[in-house]
């Protein structure tokens, strides 16, 4: 089983989608229930089989493990593998998807197609995190747009068509430059093998282009091409504007997948490609990325403060939290990258839970306007408690996973740039401001609005969906070494290779390159 384990985990959802497409018949309630149960079964099996990856994984071995490789088309290879960085994203994906399906039990329109879309999306997301061939990675990375485009465009809100096309075009245009860069890399190296490309040293000699001096040469241009794609995916300021629209229009399950998993592809891309393949380009562009990140943290936190739509507020909160991730990654030290990966994992649980919370009251009241609520704690005490827990985790309360990621990230950046660190720390205060403001407006006070007097608290199924999310948020908050021990050796190797590449290039503190 070991040899094909990664392929089995990757393609269980896609094969299940095919079975659902061929076997399921009818559009009545019974057929819809069969589709839901089958999708839940398929995603649960995927999760339990993926646990074998963790069992067989050796954290001390920093090379790729359980590698599967076979010739594919035109000399490109079908190659999968996991290391200490990618294994966490694989597990996050397989962990979240059964909860997403479970939370979609109330969907009534085109249920079979809805479940097929999510099953295909899971396979494509897993492929992104396991692919060890550049072409294979790109295919998974881009193909993932299609199911998400359909999920927003078919099952979304009133402006779903606009939001879905905006999401599609932003991410597609960002990836055009990455595709050009891949062609350049293949032309220079003759391979698309990611392991081989990580050990290849691309030129960092300065050259002129259109009258401009390109410091860092080819590496800087390749870095910028990949950066364009990953910055949109994160998303980073100022290319974040597709995210609030996509979140607001997406169905609840779509928002959960978008926030919990899809955004993490950008951070994963920086860790898998930018730092190891273009270390000199990454170093030269570090200040640029750090300032964009800190602007994102402060600006989107302030924008979140004035939102009237709950989903939009949480969407802007996501952009701010992803700002901490890019700060941690480009701090390029052990604490920074540990914190960035931890933050991405934690954000997956917390933001996913917050979107589920919004979905629960939207299903009852069919509005996300903050002003439409107030005093819900009187009618929905269990809901108020769960919302409070994840609000506090989002703020970074000690004892929750949200604290560990932010703390490590800030420790990492303090060693690199004190001003960036101080400005980023202000984001912690701002996140407390908008999160507690949201909670007070929705939950506290008297139950004045007539429409809320008959609202029902969470059902048993709705409560059950949150149990694993609460468990993971607490477990990683009080016992973070569970994750840090898993990623530590791989992160240390990444940092060591990055620093050795810089020293070989003769880079000194002011980002100039020694002549050679």
Model-derived regions: residue spans:
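Transmembrane helix-loop-helix hairpins at membrane boundaries of multipass inner-membrane proteins
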Residues: 1-5, 19-116, 195-206, 211, ...
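Central hydrophobic cores of alpha-helical transmembrane segments in multi-pass inner-membrane proteins
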Residues: 7-25, 40-53, 90-104, 121-123, ...
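Alpha-helical transmembrane segments and their helix-start/interface "positive-inside/aromatic belt" motifs
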Residues: 32-44, 162-174, 380-384, 460-468
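Hydrophobic alpha-helical membrane-insertion segments
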Residues: 41-55, 171-183, 393, 429, ...
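Helix-to-loop transition at the C-terminal end of transmembrane segments
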Residues: 53-64, 185-192, 480-485
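Hydrophobic transmembrane alpha-helices and their helix-loop junctions in integral membrane proteins
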Residues: 101-105, 123-135, 148-438, 443
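Short phosphate-coordinating micro-motif centered on Lys-Gly-acidic
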Residues: 142
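Cytoplasmic/organellar membrane-interface segments at the starts of transmembrane helices
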Residues: 380-382, 435-516
